[in-house]
């Protein structure tokens, strides 16, 4: 199957699953098809699809990621011992584990085509990720607390695993509690990674987007926490993944990188 054929197969399956399929799909260009497919994946509840869907979905997502271009963490240059800075799309990074800035449901973002990292990671990992997260949360029986960490497979992403953590939500003035909770996100992800023998972890800028944590303060907390952890745990590579130019500028300034 071509990518176009896979995309239309998946759209038709997801419409039929929702009992909303028309006799024939309306004409759509490639970008419209991609938006419709992503929207349907985003709103899909965690339930087992059939084997044909998974086979086509996996082939489709892996090709989409390959076309975006995969970056191997082993090719990155450190900014200091054990620490790396990378500007790019975390869903294209090949490493031990990437960190997802999750919400307390831990099921991913249900808003169609939302631009948050939670949406992107669940979209390109595939429906299996939401299924695994749902199993974890069903067993747990209560919302995920702020500052903790959970580990899942990464499925169709280039990384081996995804670490999920819920950062603090800032609704007013930043507090010491907020800062401690953010530090806990980094520490608990690294502790869990070390426990599982994961050798490289890529952190997004936790809480700085939809959760409104001040970017510069968050970066200082992230770097300080990671440096402290690496003093006693030198076997893990830590990658600070930044997507926005302003975050890249902040991290470069803190690390003293020119240009």
PLM regions: where:
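Macrodomain-like recognition of ADP-ribose-binding/processing modules
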Residues: 1-259
């Amino acid at each position: 199957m071509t990518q176009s054929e896979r995309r239309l197969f998946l759209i038709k399956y997801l419409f039929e699953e929702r009992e909303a399929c028309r006799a024939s799909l309306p004409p759509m260009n490639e970008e419209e098809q991609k938006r419709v497919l992503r929207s349907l994946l985003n709103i899909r509840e965690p339930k087992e699809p059939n084997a044909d869907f998974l086979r086509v979905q996996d082939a489709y997502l892996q090709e989409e990621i390959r076309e975006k271009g995969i970056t191997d963490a082993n090719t990155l240059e450190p900014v200091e011992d054990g620490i790396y800075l990378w500007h790019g799309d975390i869903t294209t990074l090949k490493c031990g584990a990437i960190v997802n800035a999750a919400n307390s449901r831990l099921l991913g973002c249900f808003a169609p085509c939302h631009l948050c990292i939670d949406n992107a990671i669940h979209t390109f990992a595939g429906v299996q990720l939401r299924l695994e997260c749902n199993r974890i949360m069903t067993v747990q029986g209560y919302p995920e607390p702020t500052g903790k960490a959970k580990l899942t497979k990464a499925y169709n992403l280039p990384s081996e695993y995804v670490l999920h953590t819920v950062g603090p939500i800032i609704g007013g003035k930043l507090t010491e509690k907020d800062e401690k909770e953010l530090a806990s996100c980094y520490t608990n992800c690294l502790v869990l990674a070390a426990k599982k023998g994961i050798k490289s972890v890529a952190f997004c800028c936790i809480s700085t987007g939809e959760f409104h944590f001040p970017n510069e303060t968050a970066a200082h907390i992230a770097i300080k926490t990671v440096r402290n952890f690496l003093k006693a745990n030198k076997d893990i590579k830590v990658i600070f993944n930044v997507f926005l130019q302003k975050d890249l500028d902040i991290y470069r300034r803190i690390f003293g990188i020119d240009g």
